[in-house]
Amino acid sequence: MDQKRLTHLRQLEAESIHIIREVAAEFSNPVMLYSIGKDSSVMLHLARKAFYPGTLPFPLLHVDTGWKFREMYEFRDRTAKAYGCELLVHKNPEGVAMGINPFVHGSAKHTDIMKTEGLKQALNKYGFDAAFGGARRDEEKSRAKERIYSFRDRFHRWDPKNQRPELWHNYNGQINKGESIRVFPLSNWTEQDIWQYIWLENIDIVPLYLAAERPVLERDGMLMMIDDNRINLQSGEVIKKRMVRFRTLGCWPLTGAVESNAQTLPEIIEEMLVSTTSERQGRVIDRDQAGSMELKKRQGYF
């Protein structure tokens, strides 16, 4: 394939499809982590392209915390059904029994038990040796230094000082029993690339990414959208309808909205061209402590 004749987005697309096919051929039991966000939607679209007209040769896995937006759950089930994907949903049973939730136990403990431990449980349960993730290098500094093939030991831990070299497009997938690889086919994409590709390919996304009047309150410097009745209002807090959208999606008590009037994909792309902040500024879990994302990844996080 002549790279000089491909547009920037088509080069990224070709690279990602190559990575997805490489993993499917090289590993015995891969899985695609599906978190329902825009990056997951693009990654799923690329995987479907990679194996068209056949079906995906691996399942989707959603590690559920029980605190995603209702629109995310509806979108997840609708998408899996529409594309004929095998969807596995895992929720940490110990965390459920303990009643872990972000309001009572805080973002760090909630994330560790319901997401990190939940993911490790699911990978062990099904014996997956490779897991696709939608992380990109431009999102956060610890992700910027992570390889496309990210080696994890038998405890699912990542050691940033012991990463394998990746020369050109040669990836080292050699692992021993119990070890695994996290694979990031969108590593070289930016947030702007993602949105332009969604618009170019007409990819369906969760409506929460588009601006609309939604019930929100201000807490800890964040606009929190109230998605159900599991919240206790603090003194002086008032729920108001405001025009907001989300740049990133996660558990609703831990994901801040941004004020915006961007109701279409071209308007989002235009908004991104002048944005000077990271999309993850609204993620409470990234504020837990200095280097919190790298620490989480060392412990087995996505």
Curated annotation (Swiss-Prot):
Known EC number: 2.7.7.4
Catalysed reactions, semicolon-separated: sulfate + ATP + H(+) = adenosine 5'-phosphosulfate + diphosphate
EC main group: transferase
Pathway: Sulfur metabolism; hydrogen sulfide biosynthesis; sulfite from sulfate: step 1/3
Keywords: ATP-binding, Nucleotide-binding, Nucleotidyltransferase, Transferase
Keyword set includes Nucleotide-binding: yes
GO process annotations (BP): hydrogen sulfide biosynthetic process; sulfate assimilation
GO molecular function: ATP binding; sulfate adenylyltransferase (ATP) activity
Described function: With CysN forms the ATP sulfurylase (ATPS) that catalyzes the adenylation of sulfate producing adenosine 5'-phosphosulfate (APS) and diphosphate, the first enzymatic step in sulfur assimilation pathway. APS synthesis involves the formation of a high-energy phosphoric-sulfuric acid anhydride bond driven by GTP hydrolysis by CysN coupled to ATP hydrolysis by CysD.
Protein family: Belongs to the PAPS reductase family. CysD subfamily.
Assembly and binders: Heterodimer composed of CysD, the smaller subunit, and CysN.
Designated name of the protein: Sulfate adenylyltransferase subunit 2
Organism per entry: Escherichia coli O1:K1 / APEC
